[in-house]
Amino acid sequence: MFNDNTNKMNRSILDIQASALVISQFTLCADTKKGRRPSFLNAESPELSKKLYEYFKVSLRKRGMLVDYGQFGSLMKVKLVNDGPVTFVLDSKQ
């Protein structure tokens, strides 16, 4: 998802030897179409979400990625620099 020398998105995080920051964020599933508060009915249960989060962490480590992690389910102040302005939403449902 990173540009090569021809400005095409042909390089991976492993190719460019960058690091990633993995943070759980259930608010990405918020439905804000109705009312004054977001609905989180589409979010997965906390139990399954934590298992998936841990699985994802292990998967990245196995691939040799340099990764830092947030603590699942905790409130955090996160400072980062995005390499963008590109954002991808990765959906595992097939």
Regions from the PLM with identified roles:
Residues 5-20, 68-81:
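Glycine/charge-rich, flexible interdomain linkers and switch-proximal surface loops
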